[in-house]
Amino acid sequence: AACVISEHIRRPEQLRFYAVGLLENMKLADSLGLTKIQRRHIDRIRSEFEQRCGMDAAAFLAQARYDAVDSIVRQAAGHAAKRPHTWSDRFDALALNRFLAFPIFAAVVSMMFTICFGSMGLAMKRAAEQFFIQAADFLRRALPEFGVSNFWIGLAADGVAGGVGSVLAFLPQVALIFLCLTILEECGYLARAAFLMDYFLRRIGLTGKSFIPLLMGFGCTTSAVMAARTLGSDRDRRMTILLTPYLSCSARLPIYVLLTGVFFPSHQGAAVAMLYLLGIAAACAVGFWLRTGPYRTYSAPYLMELPPYRVPSLRNVLHSTFSKCGDFLRKAGTLIFLLSVLIWMMQHINLHLLWTADASQSIFTAVGNALAPLFRPLGFGNGKAAVALLAGLVSKEAVVSSLGVACAGAHSFETALTELFTPLSAASFLTFCALYAPCVSALATMRRELHSIKTTVIAAVSQILVAYGAALAVYQIGLLCQRVLSSFP
């Protein structure tokens, strides 16, 4: 066949391709411009070829190609099987072992919490607190020398330094959280965690692919909701968006650290971990309900390629950590600053918009007294706590800054908090803070990603009701246990 068509082929390297092609299909003869005699010659060659091999020429050539592919695959597979195990493979034999994987994961998470909330994190927090306390005292001493009025002194020392400083005091521990998560991501362990979580996420109707957006929810709910765009299934994307707000974002961390440090100092790390687990449990419960109700369909299979373990790049780790801390600082420097000033002004202006030295006549007290009865069954039916929760809908950091401004006149912030809460009511307050609706920025992002105001409002109201029910259960069950224990001599 090659001899017959050689005069029609301009490039010698194409001769074999066209010769084999003519044995399979004569349509190539038209493109080559073969004569009738040449076509009959090719037909005779094909007939002789089929008689010798005992089958159709096209089928024979197809089988030959499959045999060649099989041979290549066997060679490649045999070569891969002989590849020596790397240290990544050896570590995965432990990190992904069916019996050891989850204890290792728990140990990694426990180590992270110990670093952030143990002696090192606590010492860094106390140093930051002392800095802002001294800054406020300095303003109170220095500003009168420049003839500044008491109004501006109070605003600067109690409003700004007391409000913004109460949030920035937790920056060291927030930075440690970001640092640990970045290291785990850089070294490749977070991808293994996503693989491990696939089994559990399927129990609530999701896949391991949702783990990364959900994990980002521990940093910022807004960015986590936007990260859900990467999910291929619309069902998985919507479910992930609805469950993410139940996970404790970094903005809630200052609330946890503040109150657990005051009321549960001996078990602060365990208390903070339990609040994170509470959010995870709530997300699982809601996800299970969604899977059996509104989103009763099967999720798509999850396929992923595990990256090799790498030594984290110091440059990347520091850049990511500083970038995330920068977002925290920008929020403290803008939104928290404005809220702190607003709350301080509300404490010193009455309902007639006139300056008042009597805090009981202020707008702050009026709003707090109106909201307080709603939270009385939860154990913290006081105006300061109610207004702090209301401010938390704007930004969760504002809960701490609101309490800081409200308690600015006290000798000690911690002492003022013990007058607002008991250990039991503080536990109830923390439960509510861990579960209630996210900030307005996250809600706006949810509305944009879900393309539905109705769904967003239902999600926010449902989350507030879940938080209220959980806090009510904590406080009322705690009261019952106290009564039972007090009945024993």
What is the predicted role of each segment?
Residues A1-A81:
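Alpha-helical transmembrane helix bundles of large polytopic membrane transport and channel proteins
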Residues A1-F17, L215, T222-A300, G404:
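Conserved phosphate-handling catalytic cores of large alpha/beta enzymes
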Residues R52, A59-Q63, L122-G159, I204, ...:
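Extended, low-charge hydrophobic alpha-helical regions
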Residues A58, R74-S88, F132, A142-I153, ...:
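Short, membrane-interfacial amphipathic segments enriched in basic
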Residues A95-F195:
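Core alpha-helical transmembrane segments of integral membrane proteins
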Residues I104-I115, I177-T182, T260-V262, Y276-L290, ...:
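Hydrophobic core segments of alpha-helical transmembrane domains in multi-pass membrane transport
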Residues Q130, Q134-F138, A193-T221, R296-S320, ...:
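Juxtamembrane inter-helical linkers in multi-pass membrane proteins
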Residues S250-A273, S441-S452, A473-R483:
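Transmembrane helix-loop junctions at the membrane interface of multipass transporters and ion channels
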